[in-house]
Amino acid sequence: IRKMKNKKGFTLVELIVVLVILAILAALLVPALTGYIDKANYEKVVATTRSVVMAAQTEYSEAYGKGTAVALAATAEANTTDIGKAACKLAEITDSADKYINDIKSVKLTGTATDGVITKVEVTQGKYICVYEKNGLTSTTDYKYTSGNYGVKAAS
């Protein structure tokens, strides 16, 4: 009996109980963490789009002031037009060869030459597409996440 009392440490049952409790806690935390990860990814593409919107509006306003603004249609990639290339460089989303970086697959700008305003920007980054609409999103039901004039949906 004395030998049993002098033994220190945990019994096998105590260790198993602790492991079961840790497994239950981990199972409860995993769904919450994936929600945070998704929200962080949404915010990342929104931040990229905000940067593109600011850069595009800066370049477009400058062209409008010089009288060289042309209508931008969302059918062409931004890195193929002069204003788009300048905006992409300013937003730091292209390399020196005008190729997209940081998992950006597509950037499309829409602007009106009559008033020099960028009206719509669409950025595809990773698995998500973020859309900016100057006058607010026309429909918020299409998006998994919205923030002001920005909406994020899954890329197809």
Regions from the language model: what does each represent?
Residues I1-K7:
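Bacterial Sec-dependent N-terminal signal peptides
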Residues K7-T34:
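N-terminal single-pass transmembrane signal-anchor helix
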Residues L22-L25, Y36, A55, E59-E62:
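Short hydrophobic alpha-helical module
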Residues L33-V53, A63:
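Aliphatic-rich helix starts adjacent to a transmembrane/signal segment
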Residues M54-A74:
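Alpha-helix exit/C-cap motif
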Residues T68-S139, A155:
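Extracellular/periplasmic head regions of type IV pilus-like filament subunits
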Residues T138-S156:
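Short, low-complexity, Pro/Ser/Thr/Gly-rich segments in the mature regions of secreted, periplasmic
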